[in-house]
Amino acid sequence: MAAAAVAATATTTLLLLLLCVLALSQAFYLPGLAPVSFCEKAEEHLNCLSTIELYMNRLDSVESVLPYEYNAFDFCKAPESKQRPTENLGQVLFGERIEPSPYKVTFKEETACAALCEPKVYEPGSAVDQANLDFLKKAMHFNYQHHWIVDNMPVTWCYHVDEGKLFCNPGFPVGCYVTASGQPKDACIISTEFKEPDSFYLFNHVDVTLSYHSGAAEGWEGARLVAAKVVPRSIKHAVNEKPTCTGPPLSIPQSGTERVTVLYTYSVSFVETNNIKWASRWDYILESMPHTNIQWFSIMNSLVIVLFLSGMVAMIMLRTLHKDIARYNQMDSVDEAQEEFGWKLVHGDVFRPPRKGMFLSVCLGSGTQIFIMTFITLFFACLGFLSPANRGALMTCAVVLWVLLGTPAGYVSARMYKTFGGEKWKTNVILTAFLWPGLVFADFFMMNLILWAERSSAAVPFGTLVVVLALWFCVSVPLTFLGAYFGFRRRPIEHPVRTNQIPRQIPVQSLYTRPLPGTVMGGVLPFGCIFIQLFFILNSIWSHQMYYMFGFLFLVFIILLITCSEATILLCYFHLCAEDYHWWWRAFLTSGFTAVYLLAYAVHYFRHTERHTHTKLAIEGVASTILYFGYTLIMVLIFFLFTGTIGFFACFWFVTKIYGVVKVD
């Protein structure tokens, strides 16, 4: 009954936490970001601007992992007098490259079919012209998307999808392609005019609509932008005439034997929309994201199932152990105890130091560093500090925290290594500081070389790599040494029972208590509580969707913590009952095996992404495939250390507790 009450209380607490987090998530702009007011040109002053700056972010595609800067294409360029905005560390590492645009937008000054720059002419005999045109064709073939920013919010392309639902995409395509058989691809399906076989249609005109909330009736000056929408169009403008933005679409044949002239034009209109508040201006984007509503029900269903299973595991463990310990302590005969209690028989071997204790302690140190970093990052994300409106903040926060958390990594690694009886403290601290971070950086650097070779905007500049290395060597490494110093100065962790000099022979094990089957089974339940969130996280990374439901993610993090702990404890108990006392590595690998399921799911996502998400992943090309699996490997390694550390310390606590409450002669 007590166990049931504890489980019920835990469930209630978690559900209350969910409600609190969801309430906090409504305050999207609560911390750190202030609104900008805009006025007409005649009323402009320091706190009320008339010029609306339009910025261009990188162009990306769901069919390629290689993003490119706006200026990598032969589009109209911004004047050199315009300054490029400064990007933070997180933006650079994520591959964001924000540049000023050539578009001129003034508040409440509407523009109709204005030429953006001089026409672009591509001669069939010019190698430079054909290279520029071929690069544009590549962008249209792989459905590359523009990403524009106005007043720190994305310019969206809204269109109707299944069942008439309005979907607002924070990007719009460069153009589209009609195959040689006449089959329109991607955005070419929106119009029957796109019908020329084996032809590209470049979207060279945009209709931009800016919605604003006026402060005239609310006592504050000017107006605030609450929505920015764009409608791309393909128009074949008449040569040497003033553009009218009417006429057939601009068709570019696959063959480069014809002269192509491209004139880029734009229109801007303003709409007063006072029913949308500035603080909730992202709602129309977030609410239209694919499967947003389904995610609520799926996650709740998953959480209820996981909580139910966790409660059952907790009740079984508490009741079984309570009876075992009570009955054992009442027995006077050692023979009686040996008859019924397998886990008690190995008390003299259960704390025997593990093989490869050096490597295990290094894994635990790095895993602790990742665990604390993840917890703090998700906590700040729940409070709204790391929302999509605060660009690059999530990655910046994670990197800075990882650097500053070298001390607990060194301390845990040193303390556990000393507990294992290790004496090579120099090797331990060096491996803790360099082994896993070095492997991750080596993988990241190899991926960066590919991005450099492909001239992608996602390639991290050399200067930023130097900064990352400086943070690692000059901050993280010294802090790791400092933590290791304090760890080695402490006494080893005292075990509740003594270890025998002669190891006990382990009996023949049944199938489910052998190392491999137990390890494979141990990762199933933890993976079951994250795979729904994992789908949306992978969509955010590879399909360029916004991820903003950090409240759910934090709750899933807590459930993952509980599930990894309980699954590892349960299997550890079964192995001890089978008189197998080699639990150290098994505890780490049991929960760490969840990372193998993560890898399998990433492979499945790569090959069979759902076809009704409006962001179907269809990566093509050797470079993109290598990049996908290279970055996936980094994610899997980090997740392996994270989950393995959770399972190990849960099992370590469990074993210490149960052997601390029994009477040993």
Where do the model's predicted regions map?
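Classical eukaryotic N-terminal signal peptides for Sec-dependent ER targeting/secretion
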Residues: 1-19
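Hydrophobic alpha-helical transmembrane segments corresponding to the first two to three helices
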Residues: 283-453, 485-486, 490
